[in-house]
Design a protein with these regions (language model features):
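A detector for small-residue-rich transmembrane helices and their helix-helix packing motifs
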Residues: 1-221
């Protein structure tokens, strides 16, 4: 078994503290702790269940579900990816634009997932769709940046540096392939369609969310 864990961009550093990214992480952790206290009833109430949404109930869960997680490994993995790519995108867009970008990306991702299985009663939850939007935005904004990553192959562990285009591009292809395999599955699992939907949203709209200041610099080059 193996994997690649992104740690952060080594090609640039944000000009300011990524307060919004930190806030998003803290909110996710708070909600997860609340989940542990509330149990299954809390998860069912605030996760996005396609059959309920398409019957006209629980539309708010399209928003709330992006702050929910199924396990410690789920939230830790998501927050690692957010911390690896979020600060640079927050710096690029500005705090307010970045927050809107993140939230809308999460909503679009959740809609993509539930639209594929409108009659499913499986709860959909997780920040990965919104984070996929951040990754899509990062890919089109900083494709040549090097990402410090931990490469794990069985017992072999190594710090390596991988171009963002290669790392994120490969990740997206795996999600796209997996989404095609499970598009109509009714059982629980990874929300690949949310990843794909969020990523495409991020890649297509990231430039629109760039700060006015950065656009001015880019247009004058």
């Amino acid at each position: 078994m193996g994997g690649l864990i992104p740690l952060g961009d080594v090609s640039r550093r944000p000009a300011r503290v990524p307060l919004v990214t930190v806030l998003i992480i803290l909110v996710n952790v708070f909600v997860f702790v609340r989940e542990l206290m509330g149990g299954e009833a809390f998860v069912t109430q605030w996760s996005a269940i396609p059959a309920q949404i398409f019957s006209g109930h629980g539309w708010i869960t399209i928003f709330t579900a992006m702050f929910m997680h199924a396990s410690w490994s789920h939230i830790i993995g998501n927050m690692i990816f957010l911390w690896a790519f979020g600060p640079e995108m927050e710096d690029t867009m500005g705090r307010a634009r970045y927050l809107v970008f993140y939230l809308v990306g999460g909503i679009v991702a959740m809609l993509a997932q539930i639209a594929a299985s409108p009659h499913s009663n499986v709860p959909n939850l997780g920040a990965s769709g919104a984070i996929a939007a951040v990754m899509g935005g990062f890919l089109v904004t900083y494709p040549r940046d090097r990402i410090r990553s931990i490469l794990v192959i069985f017992i072999f562990v190594k710090i390596t540096f991988i171009p963002a285009a290669l790392l994120i591009g490969f990740w997206f292809l795996t999600q796209l392939f997996s989404a095609g395999q499970v598009a109509h599955a009714q059982s629980g699992g990874v929300a690949y369609l949310a990843h794909v939907g969020g990523f495409i949203f991020g890649a297509v709209t990231a430039r629109l969310f760039e700060s006015t200041e950065r656009r001015s610099v880019a247009s004058s080059v």
